[in-house]
Amino acid sequence: MMWTALLLVGLSILVIVLYGRRTRRRNEPPLDKGMIPWLGHALEFGKDAAKFLTRMKEKHGDIFTVRAAGLYITVLLDSNCYDAVLSDVASLDQTSYAQVLMKRIFNMILPSHNPESEKKRAEMHFQGASLTQLSNSMQNNLRLLMTPSEMGLKTSEWKKDGLFNLCYSLLFKTGYLTVFGAENNDSAALTQIYEEFRRFDKLLPKLARTTINKEEKQIASAAREKLWKWLTPSGLDRKPREQSWLGSYVKQLQDEGIDAEMQRRAMLLQLWVTQGNAGPAAFWVMGYLLTHPEALRAVREEIQGGKHLRLEERQKNTPVFDSVLWETLRLTAAALITRDVTQDKKIRLSNGQEYHLRRGDRLCVFPFISPQMDPQIHQQPEMFQFDRFLNADRTEKKDFFKNGARVKYPSVPWGTEDNLCPGRHFAVHAIKELVFTILTRFDVELCDKNATVPLVDPSRYGFGILQPAGDLEIRYRIRF
């Protein structure tokens, strides 16, 4: 028995040593393996991806390969070639890693999972007439949730809250009622669902990276179990209509032979996908407005000028707010686009330089660093400038340049050309409606006049819209 154990240990060490001897071949990206065999840069990468990858970019340029926990990951930071590279679905697979994350985070397996067909199905329900219907339903649900009685407000009295909690809870509850078709708008029940979702959401990065401890795992598992129960058709107030987005998704799962247990787990996946980003984004928008008086005045003036417009018209005629939103997303949208390299592949950067990728490696694109935080594209990229996406005449600014050449993307909050988030228009409508409602129906101010927006939680890099490490304390009351 002892000899068997020693043999296994010896073989493991041999594999690590042999795999760790990888060297850079001709025309491959710069290779940075780190100091620790096998582990490489995994700890630094997971702790703060933006800080680590920024350091690697300064050292190696727009493309490099790093070792992390036995994997070799090529990071591409040339935004002008994102589309050309990611469009090669024959060499780059997005399904395998998605399956890994689904298992780790949601404890679910969907053998027939097809991201492309799922995206096309979602696009059918989040554009055109369906989008208008969803937006109207969202607006009605938000108004119900923001009545004085629902918000616990009394005449002329101030109420204190954390801005992140306020924005996230309101948009989560609104989205839950709108997208999942739940008719039960009981305040206590909705709050309970939101609180369990937040318990789960806080631990999601650790679940994804398998760095969760025993106590945290128990908390996440308990929250998952409760959410699964609430998200079954019997847990919702009615069975989703087949022509609705949720109904079509359930039917797709059934057609693929997914059993009932896995279907309810898939509901939590969709809850997080549809509701995990709008609330945090609304927080950052409101946070930047409240801490930048000039931006707040400009948005208030724009809202006041459009009060007579219908919802659809008001959503389309807000260049100042749109610039605020784009600037906010530039600073806080930090998804990591990941693909597995299934066959040796050659890629060409925008400067004409060609590099080879190896089969079995992983490719990552991180738009947060480039183009969003690239100082050659955006002056003082770490600063919030509400008019960054406005021309002098207050029209939308579309042209941004790097080294004299126009860049295709000044920001990539919703994904690249062939990988756009299908729910982006609905998310923008929800964020706008919440911010407009807060600014027109309530007096809202910072508890500390000198407060600034909190720092980001670095563990959230790679998972969509960033979340703050703390909250921003505010007080608000009904406007008369």
Swiss-Prot record:
Coiled coil: none annotated. InterPro entries: Cyt_P450, Cyt_P450_CYP7A1-type, Cyt_P450_E_grp-IV, Cyt_P450_sf. Gene3D superfamilies: Cytochrome P450. Its EC number is 5.3.99.4, 4.2.1.152. It is found in: Endoplasmic reticulum membrane. One of its GO terms (biological process) is prostaglandin biosynthetic process. GO terms for cellular component: endoplasmic reticulum membrane. Substrate binds at residues 104, 110, 277, 338-339, 362. It catalyses: prostaglandin H2 = prostaglandin I2; a hydroperoxyeicosatetraenoate = an oxoeicosatetraenoate + H2O; (15S)-hydroperoxy-(5Z,8Z,11Z,13E)-eicosatetraenoate = 15-oxo-(5Z,8Z,11Z,13E)-eicosatetraenoate + H2O; (15S)-hydroperoxy-(5Z,8Z,11Z,13E)-eicosatetraenoate + AH2 = (15S)-hydroxy-(5Z,8Z,11Z,13E)-eicosatetraenoate + A + H2O. It is a single-pass membrane protein. GO terms for molecular function: heme binding; hydroperoxy icosatetraenoate dehydratase activity; iron ion binding; monooxygenase activity; oxidoreductase activity, acting on paired donors, with incorporation or reduction of molecular oxygen; prostaglandin-I synthase activity. Heme binds at residue 421. Disulfide bonds: none annotated. The chain crosses the membrane at residues 1-21. The keyword ATP-binding does not apply. Keywords: Endoplasmic reticulum, Fatty acid biosynthesis, Fatty acid metabolism, Heme, Iron, Isomerase, Lipid biosynthesis, Lipid metabolism, Lyase, Membrane, Metal-binding, Prostaglandin biosynthesis, Prostaglandin metabolism, Transmembrane, Transmembrane helix. Its cofactor is heme. PANTHER family: PROSTACYCLIN SYNTHASE, PTHR24306. Belongs to the cytochrome P450 family. Catalyzes the isomerization of prostaglandin H2 to prostacyclin (= prostaglandin I2). Catalyzes the biosynthesis and metabolism of eicosanoids. Catalyzes the isomerization of prostaglandin H2 to prostacyclin (= prostaglandin I2), a potent mediator of vasodilation and inhibitor of platelet aggregation. Additionally, displays dehydratase activity, toward hydroperoxyeicosatetraenoates (HPETEs), especially toward (15S)-hydroperoxy-(5Z,8Z,11Z,13E)-eicosatetraenoate (15(S)-HPETE). This is Prostacyclin synthase. It comes from Danio rerio (Zebrafish). The lineage of its organism: Eukaryota, Metazoa, Chordata, Craniata, Vertebrata. The gene is ptgis.
